[in-house]
A protein has these predicted regions:
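Conserved N-terminal phosphate-binding loop of PLP-dependent enzymes in the Aspartate aminotransferase
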Residues: 1-363
Length: 363
């Protein structure tokens, strides 16, 4: 592997920790050191490590066979659970990552509208080929993107009769955990409706912040929503869904059906783990409890004079990269850039311990 790496974000000079085991909110590295996990696998680890309910579901699915090459009983369970949570998702299709979900949603928008132009935002991250930090990436999905300023309502003026879709995170994740202003997001909703373009909310990270995602908190209904991360129960997962008239374009019984392939779109283990997590573990009350912990952590950090952004259980620490290794030595793991995503096993005592350790490092 080039540089010993197959996932760029995990590279931390001089070398990253190699984690060999996880249980609850704790992880252990190859040298036997123990850490409290405040990274939460960049929001994918919402359930913590080795949750017994999800483990049991995976074991049962594994015993029944995995590569069946056919529809399976778990995919309908997971589809029903997700559609039941998100009123804007009338129909859904599964894929293998948030990246894939966003590529498919954009491709659907272009096919449905017959237009090409796509509006995105500085700081937006929608996957490995949809990266819009500081001018974007040479590996980006080839399309005529127009990049606007996040949280600037005037960016809605970029939407015109040539626009197929606007793709936006209701809160920037990789771009600093910056909540979207409602006025900004509503302006995008109004502009897309006025010009016949589609509004796509990337809730790959943010769907965990409310039972109906941030779109429910904001009371703004997108045409399409993309999902990923924790919804696969800790296994590789992506999904996109939305308005029935749009998603029905993938109905294979139609003579004009749009193709959507993928060997592992309905991978048995992922479908089983995802369904178990959503129907047996995650509840609105648990989301609220974890969000309250995140709010508490932000308050504790802000009291130290550190800028702490985010919403609920997602927290962004700014300008504290210099204390990262010290925090590791104190037993706290999170992203070097300051990204924190809490998991369900964490407690108020754990959160207070993180804040105290940060205070000691900053002293």
């Amino acid at each position: 592997m080039p540089g010993g790496n197959t996932r760029s974000v995990l590279h931390v000079p001089p070398f990253p920790l190699t984690i060999v085991r996880g249980e609850g909110a704790r992880i252990w590295d190859a040298d036997g050191h123990e850490y409290l996990d405040f990274l939460g696998e960049y929001t994918a680890g919402l359930y913590g490590h080795s949750h017994p309910v999800i483990q049991a579901a995976i074991r049962q699915a594994l015993a029944d066979g995995t590569t069946l090459g056919a529809p399976n009983r778990y995919e309908t369970q997971l589809a029903a659970a997700i559609c039941g949570r998100f009123p804007s998702i009338e129909l859904i299709r599964f894929c293998n990552s948030g990246t894939e979900a966003n590529v498919m949603a954009l491709s659907l928008a272009r096919a449905a509208t017959g237009r090409e132009k796509l509006v995105v935002f500085e700081g937006g991250y929608h996957g490995g080929v949809l990266y819009f930090h500081h001018g974007g990436s040479p590996l980006n999905f080839p399309a005529p993107f127009v990049v606007g300023d996040y949280n600037d309502p005037a960016a809605a003026e970029l939407v015109d009769r040539d626009t197929a879709a606007v793709l936006v995170e209701p809160m920037l994740g990789s771009g600093g955990v910056i909540p979207g202003d409602r006025a900004f997001l509503q302006a995008l909703r109004d502009a897309t409706r006025d010009h016949g373009a589609l509004l796509i909310f990337d809730e790959v990270m943010t769907s965990r912040l409310a039972w109906g995602g941030l779109q429910d908190v904001l009371a703004i209904t997108p045409d399409l929503t993309t999902l990923g991360k924790y919804l696969g129960g800790g296994l590789a997962f992506g999904a996109f869904g939305g308005r029935r008239d749009l998603m029905e374009r993938f109905d294979p019984s139609r003579p004009d059906a749009l193709p959507h392939a993928g060997t592992f779109n309905n991978a048995v283990l992922t479908m089983a783990a995802g369904a178990a997590g959503l129907t047996q573990v995650l509840t609105p009350a648990e989301i609220g409890r974890l969000n309250a912990l995140g709010d508490h952590l932000r308050e504790r950090i802000a009291a130290l004079g550190v800028r702490a952004t985010g919403y609920g259980s997602m927290v962004g620490l700014h300008d504290v990269e210099h204390v990262f290794f010290g925090m590791l030595e104190r037993g706290y793991s999170y992203a070097r850039r300051g990204f924190v995503a809490l998991s369900l096993p964490l407690t108020e005592e754990d959160v207070d311990g993180f804040a105290k350790a940060l205070a000691a490092e900053l002293a």
